[in-house]
Amino acid sequence: IQAHPEWLRPGTNRLTASYTIPVVVHVMHTGGAVGTIYNPTDAQILGAINYLNQVFAGTYAGMTPPVEGGAVVNMEVQFAMAQRTPACGATNGIDRVDASALPNYTANGINVNNATGCPELTMKNLARWNTSNYYNIWLVNKIDGADGTSGQFIAGFAYFPGAPSTLDGTVMLATQMVAGEKT
């Protein structure tokens, strides 16, 4: 980057690769109907993915310019809802899973910081598509007992590269999957 600062200027012709990442959103609901607090609608999920794409492209109208100079740039990464399941069936990329049978899930969600709840891997093992082919996003009802509607809470998390594939992906509170939010 230091050798070619001109690459960071908007409108600069540069050699780039553009990446499209197939995404599957696993909605780990507790039996509630689509559109309830822990089971967002398809439109809500698609709106949040569209927002994510706008942020990565540098086109989201709500973005503030960099404080210390520079410019907002297109990261050349796009997230696209998966169109095929691992078995090659058609999909919209949204996988709704009733997770209410998981131990402690309905009352406390997933356990991240040694709180009461379902172990993270137990939840992920219920709904994980091959991490070599898809980016998995799990929408959960609660993390460490908090659902994101009041008080302090963990909105979501992911692991750094190098973590085992069993952990790969993003876990996010269903209440925080909202277009325009900075989660």
PLM region descriptions:
Residues 112-183:
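Active-site-proximal segment of zinc-dependent metalloprotease catalytic domains
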Residues 1-133, 140:
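Propeptide-to-catalytic entry region of secreted or membrane-anchored zinc metalloproteases
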